[in-house]
Amino acid sequence: MIKNGRIVKSLAGFYDVESEGEVYQTRARGNFRKKGMKPVVGDFVEFSTEENSEGYILKIGERKNSLIRPSIANIDQAVIIMSTVSPNFSLNLLDRFLVFLEHKNIHPMIYISKLDLLTEMQEGSDKNKKTFNQLTDYEQIKSDYEQIGYDVFFDAEHLVSNLAGKVTVFMGQTGAGKTTLLNKIAPEMQLATGETSEKLGRGRHTTRHVEFFELAGGLIADTPGFSSLDYEVTNRPDLNAAFPEILRISHDCKFRECTHTHEPSCAVKLALENHEILESRYDNYLQILDEINHTRETYEKKRKKQG
């Protein structure tokens, strides 16, 4: 019998496929390996199934997006967990997550964790050092990013109400509190929680596998923590598109290929002067643009040597 469904779990070469309320254990045909393809959690598939025997995946549907770490496809939205402390909050890292998700066409949501620990802070905030130790700092960040168009949450209850009917992944810096949050809102996941290493200031990776869980009328999955974020934005137009507020304003720039760095009549730089764009966002745009240019220059030098 041929059926259609979605992979909800992958383990040791076996794939659990949900179809019409039933879950079937399947394996992939060998021809996928020959084609360099591999089914992943989230894939919509066509599979065969016989009574009292495992099924076989016959066809993988086209993916609207996918992640490599972990291997997961067809994601609607992602919750970026950013902690206030241990690890310390970073606007630069937040913007890098946002660039990553915008480029993947995954709707981002921001959840700020460990706000309760701010009361234990004795030092004040220092904008020059980019430290944020007061609740008012995060209220301002929430307001700033909501003006851009992002959803920002301080509590799990409001976050959960946005999960219905969606496939959602949870991601963030290692130790930011992803597992703690997921165990709070979906205790059936029973994820292992790792403490943050005091010596390195980084968390141990505690997420070992990927599996969809039903929650609030949607499907959710955890992802491993990231010590660093690898993104696939390799050119200025893609980077421009990954900053929604810059993309909107850039249409008014005098030059079509404006990089928003040195060109005259740049609408983005004018908006920056008028405080219509966050300085931190613009600085992070410039930093990533510089990294893209450096990577391209390095590649060109290697190619010339080889050629």
UniProtKB/Swiss-Prot annotation:
Positions of the CP-type G domain: 64-229
Localization in the cell: Cytoplasm
Needed co-factor(s): Zn(2+)
Protein keywords: Cytoplasm, GTP-binding, Hydrolase, Metal-binding, Nucleotide-binding, Ribosome biogenesis, RNA-binding, rRNA-binding, Zinc
GO biological process: ribosomal small subunit biogenesis
Annotated Gene3D superfamilies: Nucleic acid-binding proteins, P-loop containing nucleotide triphosphate hydrolases, Probable gtpase engc, domain 3
InterPro entries: G_CP_dom, NA-bd_OB-fold, P-loop_NTPase, Ribosome_biogen_GTPase_RsgA, RsgA_GTPase_dom, RsgA_N
Repressor among keywords: no
EC assignment: 3.6.1.-
Main subcellular location of this protein, as a coarse class: cytoplasm
SUPFAM superfamilies in alphabetical order: Nucleic acid-binding proteins (SSF50249), P-loop containing nucleoside triphosphate hydrolases (SSF52540)
Positions with a binding annotation for GTP: 113-116, 172-180
GO terms under cellular component: cytoplasm
Protein role: One of several proteins that assist in the late maturation steps of the functional core of the 30S ribosomal subunit. Helps release RbfA from mature subunits. May play a role in the assembly of ribosomal proteins into the subunit. Circularly permuted GTPase that catalyzes slow GTP hydrolysis, GTPase activity is stimulated by the 30S ribosomal subunit.
Quaternary organization: Monomer. Associates with 30S ribosomal subunit, binds 16S rRNA.
Record protein name field: Small ribosomal subunit biogenesis GTPase RsgA
Taxonomic lineage: Bacteria, Bacillati, Bacillota, Bacilli, Lactobacillales
